[in-house]
Amino acid sequence: MKQQLLLLEDVDGLGRSGDIVTARPGYVRNYLLPQKKAIIAGAGTLRLQAKLKEERLLRAAEDRAESEKLAELLKDLVLEFQVRVDPDNNMYGSVTISDIIAEAAKKNVILTRKNFPNAHYAIKNLGKKSVPLKLKEGVTATLFVEVSSESAYIAVLNQQSSQEQTVAAEELE
């Protein structure tokens, strides 16, 4: 027989903080109650439920504002990766979620694995890719990732340095 519970925290697949839900006894006994994620619903829990819903609404508004701000920041951000390639321009390895998170952190953008709806996402081709992100409170964003070969990157640096040398030589004359 399922039990009625008042959730104290958001629980994936069950409900949000302040919701009264039903769950199987084993799940309740072994997970929800020991982790203090829920209490058994009774007559006295209605006041607590109202308080939890009010807190959840305030937190949801803050999370939505923060997520929209982050989505606006991500709209203009392009993460660049230089990778090793073979002569046929096939990448050695791939650009993974961990690489994207680390590169974003260097640009003061905090992302976690939870932000990536496709948990096994990896970029295996050169070029500019769009990566879908799921932020808090249903806000979605797109992050752009540009993957180029190290040899192309080195060629651009060499071209820039040769141009600088040409300018320096002209200045000496």
Curated annotation (Swiss-Prot):
- The superkingdom of the source organism is Bacteria
**PROSITE patterns per record:** RIBOSOMAL_L9
Q: Which GO terms describe its biological process?
A: translation
Pfam families xrefs: Ribosomal_L9_C (PF03948), Ribosomal_L9_N (PF01281)
Q: Does the keyword NAD apply?
A: no
Any idea which UniProt keywords this protein has?
A: Ribonucleoprotein, Ribosomal protein, RNA-binding, rRNA-binding
Q: Which InterPro entries match?
A: Ribosomal_bL9 (IPR000244), Ribosomal_bL9/RNase_H1_N (IPR009027), Ribosomal_bL9_bac/chp (IPR020594), Ribosomal_bL9_C (IPR020069), Ribosomal_bL9_C_sf (IPR036791), Ribosomal_bL9_N (IPR020070), Ribosomal_bL9_N_sf (IPR036935)
Alphabetically, the GO molecular function entries are: rRNA binding; structural constituent of ribosome
What is the protein's known function? Binds to the 23S rRNA.
Similarity-based family: Belongs to the bacterial ribosomal protein bL9 family.
> Under what name is this protein listed?
Large ribosomal subunit protein bL9
Species of origin: Chlamydia felis (strain Fe/C-56)
